[in-house]
Curated annotation (Swiss-Prot):
Lineage of origin: Eukaryota, Metazoa, Ecdysozoa, Nematoda, Chromadorea
Entry annotated with the keyword DNA-binding: no
Name of the protein this chain belongs to: Mediator of RNA polymerase II transcription subunit 15
Subunit annotation: Component of the Mediator complex. Interacts with nhr-49, nhr-64 and sbp-1.
Organism of provenance: Caenorhabditis elegans
Annotated region (Interaction with sbp-1), positions in chain: 2-96
Principal localisation: nucleus
């Protein structure tokens, strides 16, 4: 069927015809799990909810799947437990007395799902409550008065009826009218309009939610007015039998729990105002209205919440574990169910926020433990995901923003997903650590001297959970004012590791970190000195250390002061050897912005050995980390962190400058050239009027003599959405035949134009891998 046929009445009528047999099967096999309304009402609700054909078809499929799950889980063959009771969906013939006592009807005629009158709305309980209680209530109690044990289906119906425990003063007349007694346990009288049903039978006869037999069977408390119990005689028993009277505390506890679990879906209150759903409340299977909870009226939660629950959480209804159990003692069953309900509630409160759908009950206890542990481990990525989602939303990339927000809601516990989805999300976060680390890096730019425009743009977008340095960066704010360990919010936003294996390094360096915080120092022990001189061993600034590595840009200059102007080892790996520099001398100086400037030193108690791990660890990485890639425009202005000489900025020779000036009309050249090593300079180029990541050319100082190459940073923050483009660009630029700056820039622009023609959105393909998996496993 083509796309144009979707909104047509013919297309929708076909869907209604497909839904009708599923709903009829649900009414017969799952009386305790009703779907409100008939097939047309369900289809109209879905049609009003969905905005496209794909969404419409997915939602219809979810409804059918949910109905099938309910029907299969609740259907119990009547031959398993022969009884004088009928199965809950009693037929019209049984209601008229044509079925002999003790027989089981072999034919179930469906009752037309005629809507109830509006006057019966006050008697309807929240259907979600009755639905959920049907799956959590234990086996039914023994029927009083020597009645035989009910069948399996009747037992399930009786268990569900515990949730509707009314006042014993409320009697039910044969004509279907509820007579209000003295007072309902909820505090208000029960409304009692006389509303006959379309099939002519009373409200009580064959009511599946009550689980009683037809009137002709002669049960003492089943048939109507005697003793004032009506269909609830099985629950309360006759007077003098010792059965509990009035409100049921266990039932009240369940109602309280279910009411707390309901507000998770705000659309429930929105859809109940629609005419087809708000004006006529949904009827129970076979036209039996629901009973008020303990005499109370229905809650404002509209019937759409039931269908919304079926659409969103089809596995919300497990296989009714307790419905097949033998009848037990009433008090023991209630106590056991109350303890089980309390335990489940505590687990849900630990694993998710209040108001969430209890999805995780489907997991085993071992899986729940793994699920919670993974959530705790990934909780630190929430701020980064939130920042990136906000940035994508601001840039108009709503698709990427929505995906990031979905991941964020999973990590924050707002969505409970499968363990398989969580594993995939964990792998994705580990693979995208390069751009997820932008959040803490942007936050620390104030006291690390980073003034790059891109970094400032990121910092401007950090709105949640970002706080300034509590130790201050102004004159007079020495560390004598703060003697304790770093505050929790600073521990959450640690300085980034500048490696792709950040989280593994943090875990491996934890013992060393703990030792340094207590008695020693570390490579960064002098990083936040005040305007007074301190002993490196006794300064409380040692407690400020969060991570095993300091800012490499700050250490790159400090390491050169005591050892002369030459670098230690390779210049690109100077961050690794910076912690081996000698002790500093003299009092620290303050720059005009008030930021303490102190040369780095090694504490005497460590004997200069604390930096060995720092020195050698970077050598195990696949590629050495170019320090200039991590040090954007450090010395623009007077906000430097260090008292040493400024970073050496080498200018290009005249030939390279003239060539770049010719290309200035098409390319934007960063004027702040960074030194790559002793003989090469990095030139950062961008294509004008384009949002693609910049290109980093490594130009020799003797240009045009020497070879121009391309540098690809290990942590490429600008290219996190363009993995495919970057791979194709670097593959093209690695081919032979390119020698000059112009050759490289022309080839780069050509490759970008080809990529732009092939893709419309520009979103990274690697970012889109498994998008369907993300959505299919989220139980939307």
């Amino acid at each position: 069927m083509s796309e144009e046929d979707w909104p047509s009445p013919k297309f929708r009528e076909h869907v209604i015809q497909r839904l009708e047999p599923e709903l009829a099967r649900n009414r017969q096999n799952a009386p305790n799990l009703p779907v409100p309304g008939d097939a047309r009402q369900v289809e109209e609700y879905v049609f009003a909810k969905c905005m496209s054909k794909d969404e419409y078809m997915r939602t219809i499929a979810k409804v059918i799947n949910a109905i099938n799950c309910n029907s299969k889980s609740a259907a119990v063959p009547s031959v398993l437990q022969p009884s004088q009771f009928h199965s809950p969906p009693c037929t019209t013939a049984a209601l008229l007395g044509n079925t002999p006592a003790g027989g089981t009807p072999g034919y179930r005629a469906p009752v037309p799902p005629d809507p109830q009158p509006t006057s019966a709305q006050a008697r309807n309980p929240p259907v979600t409550v009755a639905t959920t209680q049907a799956s959590t209530t234990p086996s039914a109690p023994n029927p009083p008065g020597g009645l035989p044990a009910p069948s399996a289906s009747a037992t399930a119906a009786v268990a569900a009826a515990v949730a509707s425990f009314p006042s014993p003063d409320t009697s039910i007349r044969p004509g279907g009218q509820i007579t209000p007694g003295s007072q309902a346990p909820g505090g208000g009288p029960t409304p009692a309009p006389n509303v006959p049903f379309p099939n002519g039978s009373s409200q009580m006869n064959g009511g599946p939610a009550m689980g009683q037999p037809p009137p002709q069977m002669g049960a003492p408390n089943m048939g109507g007015p005697p003793n004032g119990y009506g269909g609830y005689g099985m629950m309360n028993g006759p007077p003098g039998s010792g059965a509990p009277m009035g409100g049921n505390p266990y039932n009240q506890q369940i109602k309280k729990d279910m009411d707390q679990a309901r507000p998770w879906d705000p659309s429930a209150h929105m859809y109940q105002q629609q005419p087809q759903w708000g004006a006529m409340p949904p009827q129970q299977p076979h036209g039996y209205p629901g009973r008020p909870m303990n005499g109370q009226g229905a809650t404002p939660t509209g019937p759409s919440s039931v269908l919304e629950s079926l659409i969103n959480q089809p596995q919300q209804y497990p296989g009714h574990h307790n419905q097949m159990g033998p009848p037990g003692d009433r008090n023991v069953a209630a106590q056991r169910a109350a303890a089980q309900q309390q335990q489940q509630q505590q687990q849900q409160q630990q694993q998710q926020r209040p108001g969430m759908v209890p999805n995780q009950g489907m997991m085993s206890s071992e899986d729940q433990t793994v699920y919670s542990a993974k959530l705790r481990n990934m909780r630190g990525s929430c701020d980064s995901l939130r920042t990136r989602a906000r940035q994508c939303r601001h840039e108009g990339n709503h698709e990427a923003a929505h995906k990031l927000e979905v991941m964020l809601s999973v990590l924050e516990g707002k969505r409970v997903v499968s363990l398989e989805y969580l594993n995939h999300l964990e792998m994705w976060i580990a693979r995208k650590q390069d751009f997820l680390n932008i959040a803490p890096m942007s936050q620390n730019q104030n006291h690390m001297g980073m003034n790059d425009p891109m970094m400032n743009g990121e910092h401007a977008m950090l709105g949640n959970g970002q706080v300034p340095n509590p130790y201050g960066g102004h004159p007079g704010y020495g560390h004598q004012q703060y003697m304790g360990p770093p505050p929790p919010h600073m521990q959450m936003h640690q300085p980034p590791m500048w490696h792709q294996q950040q989280h593994q390094q943090q875990q491996r360096m934890m013992p060393q970190d703990h030792m340094m915080m207590q008695g020693g120092g570390g490579p960064v022990h002098g990083m936040y000195r005040g305007d007074m001189g301190h002993d490196p061993m006794t300064s409380p600034v040692n407690n400020h250390r969060h991570a095993p590595y300091p800012n490499p840009a700050a250490m790159r200059n400090n390491m050169r002061m005591p050892n002369g102007p030459g670098p230690i080892g390779r210049d690109r790996n100077s961050m690794s050897g910076s912690s081996m520099s000698g002790p500093s001398s003299g009092a620290p100086s303050m720059n005009p912005m008030g930021t303490p400037n102190q040369k780095m030193g090694t504490p005497g108690s460590m004997g200069g050995m604390s930096g060995l791990d720092d020195l050698n660890y970077d050598d195990f990485l696949p590629n050495p980390t170019p320090i200039d890639a991590l040090q954007p425009t450090l010395h623009v202005g007077q906000n430097s962190m260090n008292a040493g000489p400024p970073v050496q900025r080498s200018n290009l020779n005249e030939t390279a400058r003239k060539e770049l000036q010719i290309l200035d009309a098409r390319f934007e050249i960063d004027p702040n050239h960074q030194r790559h090593d002793a003989n090469h300079i990095i030139v950062v180029c961008k294509i004008r009027n384009q949002q693609f990541p910049p290109l980093r050319l490594v130009v020799p100082t003797t240009y045009p003599a020497g070879n121009v190459t391309v540098d690809r940073a290990v942590i490429d923050l600008d290219a996190y959405l363009y993995d495919d483009l970057q791979n194709s660009v670097y593959e093209r630029l690695s081919r032979p035949g390119l020698s000059s700056i112009t050759d490289y820039l022309n080839a780069w622009e050509e490759q970008v134009n080809q990529y732009q023609n092939q893709t419309s959105g520009g979103l990274d393909v690697a970012f889109n891998v498994g998008n369907d998996f993300f959505y299919d496993n989220l139980n939307l």
